Amino acid sequence: ALDYYNPIAKSLMQGRLDIVDPPITYDLVHFGEKWYAPWGVLPALFFVPLQLLKGRFIPPLYITLFFASADVVVFYLILRRVKSEFFPWFTGASLWLVLALFAFGTTHAYVGTLGSVWHVGQMVTNLFGTLGLYFIFKKKRRPKDYLPSALSFGVALLGRATIVVLASIPAFFYIWDYVSP
């Protein structure tokens, strides 16, 4: 599997943004005699402390599995909130069924068990996108709920810019709650 996040993390620790002597240049951008990754740096930031701790590259699969698992936990918390605030008749068995369908019936299980550069980025970004939804998706939103949601989506954008539309959710809810008549 392609792994650019370990080399990016190593470069970050050296104060660089480019990848020094990449083993393969597939998907990289060549600019000014240097190689750069076209996607966000967010996943590499999680490799830095692990590399410092272990003194070596970390298998990307471990990061992917961790973030995929954490994403399922946050999705479970969203489902509990949906049950308590919107659908009180929703049974516990229904909640677990929806969670199982999310975890194993979507591409989440596939993407979350692979460790290539694309999958690591998607799982890290997914977690922060799901966190953003968790902070803002509630029946009685308060002004203080918007900041952690917007920050979570902002962090997610550092991983994959493809969630840019999802990042508009806090703004939509703010307009719905405070601007619209």
Q: How would you name each of these model-derived features?
A:
Residues 104-129:
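Membrane-interface micro-motifs in multi-pass membrane enzymes
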Residues 166-181:
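Perimembrane helix-loop-helix junctions
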Residues 27-55, 123:
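Short hydrophobic/aromatic helix or loop-helix immediately within or flanking a transmembrane segment
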Residues 1-4, 11, 102-108:
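Transmembrane signal-anchor helices characteristic of membrane glycosylation enzymes that use polyprenol
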Residues 100, 123-141, 153, 167-170:
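Specific aromatic-rich, kink-prone transmembrane helix
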Residues 56-88, 131:
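Transmembrane-helix motifs of polytopic, lipid-linked glycan transferases
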Residues 5-35, 42, 136:
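Extracytosolic helix-loop segments that constitute the early lumenal/periplasmic catalytic or substrate-binding loops
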Residues 75-107, 127, 140-148, 178:
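Transmembrane-helix signature of polytopic, membrane-embedded enzymes
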